[in-house]
């Protein structure tokens, strides 16, 4: 029984350490991926392309992805460069 509790504790600890990223996908121009005129599965495909688990077209008409690796660039209000000149 003690080993089982120890195993479950380690499992949850690993789950807390290996965090995944959620957010809006960002293109090279710094803008969110637009999905207004795309087919319904477009965002899910784009999210899986960057190793995300799932994605959908959010109310802002942009692709939102779940459980992506930390190296994937996501949109942030603080670092927003969309529509701004370089």
Swiss-Prot record:
Protein name, entry field: Toxin To11
Keywords for the protein's UniProt record, in alphabetical order: Amidation, Disulfide bond, Ion channel impairing toxin, Neurotoxin, Secreted, Signal, Toxin, Voltage-gated sodium channel impairing toxin
**Gene Ontology CC entries for this record:** extracellular region
One biological process term in Gene Ontology: defense response
Q: Where is the signal peptide?
A: 1-20
The UniProt family comment states: Belongs to the long (4 C-C) scorpion toxin superfamily. Sodium channel inhibitor family. Beta subfamily.
> Which positions fall inside the LCN-type CS-alpha/beta domain?
21-83
Location in the cell: Secreted
Tissue/organ expression: Expressed by the venom gland.
UniProt function note: Beta toxins bind voltage-independently at site-4 of sodium channels (Nav) and shift the voltage of activation toward more negative potentials thereby affecting sodium channel activation and promoting spontaneous and repetitive firing.
Q: Which SUPFAM superfamilies match?
A: Scorpion toxin-like
**Cysteine disulfide partners in this protein:** 31-82, 35-57, 43-63, 47-65
Q: Which GO terms describe its molecular function?
A: sodium channel inhibitor activity; toxin activity
Cysteine amide: modified positions: 82
Name the SMART domains for this protein.
Knot1 (SM00505)
Domains: entry comment: Has the structural arrangement of an alpha-helix connected to antiparallel beta-sheets by disulfide bonds (CS-alpha/beta).
- A Pfam family cross-referenced in the UniProt record is Toxin_3
